[in-house]
Amino acid sequence: MSNPFRERLDKGQVCAGVLTSMPSTNMAQMLSNSGFDWLFIDMEHGAIDIASCYNMITATSGSACSPVVRVMEPSIAFTKPVLDSGAMGVIFPMITSKETAEAAVAAVKYPPAGKRGWGPFYAPMRWQKKDSIEYYKSSDDIVIISLIEHIDAINNLSLIHISEPTRRLV
């Protein structure tokens, strides 16, 4: 399975999503089977911890809805467990500089393009990848969304924008 959310974005299609900040697998399952293209799992402003996030991502399996998680900051420590759980996109808050934008990309990508460690234990099931090489390549399909929320980000916008098909600015 590729990333249907990414495919629709790349085609310029409108993608309908829904946000949840409640740590509920039942809610994640209901929402992901309600016709949405993506499920916004909010770990920054909600009560969702990594265990709940993993279970919520698992609850989206079997649907065409891509789980996309807003992490607390653009770091490997917050991003790696979310991706290892099977997230198909990551929303990074407070991207204010070229450095924070680069840190976000590095947290998603495997070496040599990034700094993400290899942990192919759960996510390949969500991505339906049985081959390790195929799963490694699937990191290129992860949608990276940078939130522009601060005046410093506006002032640095030309530096923040990295021309890469998996990046989006909001």
Q: Where is each model-derived feature located?
A:
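Active-site-adjacent beta->alpha loops and helix N-cap segments on the catalytic face
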Residues: 3, 45-59, 74-78, 96-111, ...
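Single conserved hydrophobic/aromatic residue that forms the stacking wall/gate
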Residues: 160-170
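Glycine-rich, proline-tolerant flexible connector loops at the mouths of alpha/beta enzymes
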Residues: 27, 34-54
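Active-site glycine- and acidic-residue-rich loops that bind
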Residues: 94, 144-158
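Conserved, mostly hydrophobic/aromatic
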Residues: 18, 42, 90, 104, ...
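Short, well-ordered coil/turn segments that N-cap beta-strands
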Residues: 11-16, 36-37, 63-67, 87-88, ...
